[in-house]
Amino acid sequence: DVVAKSDWVVPAVVPAILEDVLGPVLPALRDKIVVSIVSGWDFARYEAFLAPGTHHISTIPNTPIAIGEGVLACESTHNLTEAEYAQFEETFGKIALIVPVTAAQFGPAGTLGGCTPAFTAMYLEALGDAGVKYGLSRAAAYQMAAQVLIGTGMLYLESGLHPGVLKDGVCSP
C-alpha cells in the first residue's frame, strides 16, 4: 500500500533481507524510482533482481546526511531518465554532496564516504582527550576540535589547495 502511494522507494535495510522486503512488491516498483541505500547492491545486482524497466540508482550515504552535510556516493550506471536524475540531484543535493562513481569505484567510495564519519569521530575524541589531558574542559576541547575539523575541511573545499599545502601552511607542527 505504501509503495502504491509513493513516487520514490528508498530501500534502507540490511542487505541480507532486501530480497524478502522488496520481493512481494516487485511488480509495483516498475513505475517508481528506486533509490537504494543498501550496501553491496549495485546496478547490475538490482537489474538481475528487479522487474524489467524498473528505474533505479544505487547510493551509499553517510550519517552527516542527518544534518544536511552528508556525502552520497552514487553509481554512475543507472537507468533513471534525465528528468528523474535531475530530480534525484535536486532532492538529495539538499542534504549531501553527490559524488557519481563507476561500478568499480562504488565500494571504495562507499567505504570512504560511509565509514569516515566513524574514524573522524574517533579522531575528534582523541583530540578532545588530548585537550583535557592538558587542562581544557571536555566541552571546550571537543568544541575546539570539532571546529578545527570543520574549518580545515571548508578551507580545503573553498581554496582547492592540496591537503599537503594546507598542512605545510601551519606555522607549528
Regions found by a protein language model. Give the residues of each.
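Internal alpha-helical scaffold of NAD(P)-dependent oxidoreductase catalytic cores
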Residues: 45-55, 71-109, 119-161
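Short beta->alpha linker loops
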Residues: 13, 38-41, 104, 147, ...
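Alpha-helical membrane segments and immediately flanking helix-loop junctions
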Residues: 112
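Rossmann-like NAD(P)(H) cofactor-binding subdomain of soluble oxidoreductases
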Residues: 1-74, 78
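Small-residue helix-packing motif on alpha-helices
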Residues: 2, 18, 137-144, 166
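Mobile late-domain/C-terminal helix-loop "cap" segments
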Residues: 156-167, 171-173
